[in-house]
Amino acid sequence: MNKYKRIFLVVMDSVGIGEAPDAEQFGDLGSDTIGHIAEHMNGLHMPNMVKLGLGNIREMKGISKVEKPLGYYTKMQEKSTGKDTMTGHWEIMGLYIDTPFQVFPEGFPKELLDELEEKTGRKIIGNKPASGTEVLVELGQEQMETGSLIVYTSADSVLQIAAHEEVVPLEELYKICKIARELTLDEKYMVGRVIARPFVGEPGNFTRTPNRHDYALKPFGRTVMNELKDSDYDVIAIGKIADIYDGEGVTESLRTKSNMDGMDKLVDTLNMDFTGISFLNLVDFDALFGHRRDPQGYGEALQEYDARLPEVFEKLKEDDLLLITADHGNDPVHPGTDHTREYVPLLAYSPSMKEGGQELSLRQTFADIGATVAENFNVKMPEHGTSFLNELKK
């Protein structure tokens, strides 16, 4: 008999809670995502996360300890060697990743692009982090006139290739992206995904078409999600979860437009009758505020998210478990634009915890979540991770 019928896992993308012991190796000494945001805001107002025990993990400005937290609390240390979204999420579901995915804030190395030009017979323009729509305004006309390829990236581990459908036929663009995918399997260029970005229209009026195609990497091993799906449990992926795992182990995928849309979809799944997990990623924290180094926007987004939690609490049943965590840090006052190597919070709550919660021991890997989920549903345990299921007392 499963202890919990439904587990709701929420990943607050990039919400770190202070530098990890190995932060120095990543150039991240002193990083502290929530702590620095709380200072910037002169106190964060997150009463619902505080009730769950956020301030019991660590007190910060506006976030204090409570006498009787509703849930169990601790922080987790990442074991894998990367600090990107895919590594963090894959580890949460039981994998250990020793090859970090690369990000290219200065553009891609010349050797990689030379090889791509040679293999495709087309010149490359762009080669920088850019917004997909702005890059067309800047380089779309040149691409049409020269037949070159617009190559660009973002703050994530991606290589994107844009070309006009009437200049580079779709099939050729897809073939080019497959070549780029092969080249970026090399450790020094390892990107999480290569994306074909076809567009149409005239200079001054370009639009991206729905013919986008992603060449992602599947997780390097079976995750707890695969085990759940193969045992006929539901795995409902909300937000970019299905993309992060390239659809592996997902039984239903719900797309989201924003954090608030993500919270709406979470409430929708709370109203559904299922047995298994609902897995939500709230990406705005990272994409809109962390990379853009906007502590004010980040703080407001955290408060906006916190204000939605009562709806979640209200709908949770006695045999439900809510797990809230993060996948890495992205301190908006830290130098640069990259993620930061930090501990992440872990909060566990069920309405069946009548006595309230207490501190769990420090988790040595994010995979402890995957192990806990696996034990609850009695599926094959991941190679990595230690379950804390039995520490959660009803």
UniProtKB/Swiss-Prot annotation:
Amino acids binding Mn(2+) 2: 286, 291, 339
Compartments it resides in: Cytoplasm
Pfam families reported for this sequence: Metalloenzyme
Annotated residues for binding of Mn(2+) 1: 13, 327-328
Pathway: Carbohydrate degradation; 2-deoxy-D-ribose 1-phosphate degradation; D-glyceraldehyde 3-phosphate and acetaldehyde from 2-deoxy-alpha-D-ribose 1-phosphate: step 1/2
Named cofactor requirement(s): Mn(2+)
Record function comment: Isomerase that catalyzes the conversion of deoxy-ribose 1-phosphate (dRib-1-P) and ribose 1-phosphate (Rib-1-P) to deoxy-ribose 5-phosphate (dRib-5-P) and ribose 5-phosphate (Rib-5-P), respectively.
Protein's name according to its UniProt entry: Phosphopentomutase
Organism: Bacillus mycoides (strain KBAB4) (Bacillus weihenstephanensis)
Upper lineage: Bacteria, Bacillati, Bacillota, Bacilli, Bacillales
Gene: deoB
